[in-house]
Amino acid sequence: KAEEEVEKNKEEAEEKAEKKIAE
């Protein structure tokens, strides 16, 4: 379902942002 994809993408984007901040 499209909504599930959006949620997954949002979570992945947040994880990437956190990793960037941690570096």
UniProtKB/Swiss-Prot annotation:
Query: Composition bias, kind Basic and acidic residues: at what positions?
Result: 7-23
Q: What does this protein do?
A: Gp22 functions in head assembly. Internal peptide VII: Cleavage product of Gp22 that is incorporated into the mature phage head.
Q: What is this protein called?
A: Major prohead-scaffolding core protein Gp22
Q: Which organism is it from?
A: Enterobacteria phage T6
Annotated stretches, region: Disordered: 1-23
* Coiled-coil parts of chain: none
The gene name reads: 22
